[in-house]
Amino acid sequence: IFKDKSKLKDVPEEGELVRWMQQQGQIYNTFGLYQTKEYGLLSEWKKIGERKEGGQCRPFNKMTVEGNVITKEGVDEQGKALAVREKAWYKYVINKNYKQIPQIYSFEPFAMQKINGKNIYQYDLQLEQQKEVIDKLVKCLKELHTFGKAPADYFSIYEAYLGKTFKRLEKIRDLVPFANEKYIVVNGRKCRNVFFYKDELIKKFENYKCNEFVFLHGDNTFSNMMLDDETMSPVLIDPRGYFGYTEMYGDVVYDWAKLYYSIVGNYDQFNLKRFRLQINENDVMLDIESNHWEAVEDYYLDLIKDEVDKNTIKLIHAIIWLSLTTYAWEDYDSICGAFYNGLYYLEEVL
């Protein structure tokens, strides 16, 4: 728009930009911003997000709602590939007579029941009510995990936890402030930078124990689980359908860590851009709005203690945050925030 930045050198710090431009005696070429909307105030933009909440989808998906029917469609190669896996997952659990999913009306087009309820993070529940919901979530996930077993595949474990993460991190190294510093201070915590401590992270997996794979959901955050308003029963949506190089099956810890991601990590608020990132001269401050489920952390971990220990959950949780970096490619603050949050949690277990 401006080929010579000197044209803007005298822009005042306050006031209306357009009015100032009118006073400069310059001639500008204009073009129409068709199919766009001016919001003016941040509060108006937030209202749009609130109306969309619960109906948001990733940039690679398109979702339409007609009455009580939701139709999903992949809009690019990534979205189409994920749709194939999602459909296969639903077909599998339908054959197992699994009840904690929406009714599927057709696979071509991919149409399903619109649940009369909300995503779990949208509910304002008391502590005892939250515990009841956690009980139900753990129960329905454990049922899901009984639908099949497969030999553990080391290459899939490495790819899901390390290979994929390192590949994504390399793409953003030149984008993130302090990425070339050995330590980064995040929320007052001096954190080892994974770019300099990659070997230490790899060593954490040298003795990683996973004897067998189970059938997974793979993306069971609060954003992908709803509660039926009438029965308060969980409804699982948007399954991932793969783990590393393995279709359908994977490390059971991954599902438990994804739930922890919402309970403690407040991923769902981060995903809605409800966070404040402040990059200072020598440190970083990241404040993510809370889902208000942190109080059930110990209760949740106690329910799954026979399948995974606390430190392992924390390790995988940190890796999931680091992996989010390029998955949030459409928003620079989200890229940086996911990286810094991953380092913050990784420091607890590295």
Which residue stretches match the model-derived regions?
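Active-site Asp-x-Gly
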Residues: 229-285
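Helix-rich C-terminal or lid/interface subdomains of diverse kinases
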Residues: 25, 41, 132-136, 167-178, ...
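Conserved HxN/HPN-centered segment at the entrance to the catalytic loop
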Residues: 94-109
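Catalytic-core segments of class I nucleotidyltransferases/pyrophosphorylases
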Residues: 1-48
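Active-site donor/metal-binding and catalytic loop motifs
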Residues: 32-43, 70-71, 111-117, 237-242
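Active-site acidic catalytic loop and adjacent metal/ATP-binding pocket
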Residues: 63, 200-250
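ATP-binding glycine-rich loop module of kinase domains
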Residues: 56-88, 113, 120-126
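Conserved kinase catalytic-core helix
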Residues: 92-98, 120-183, 194-209, 216, ...
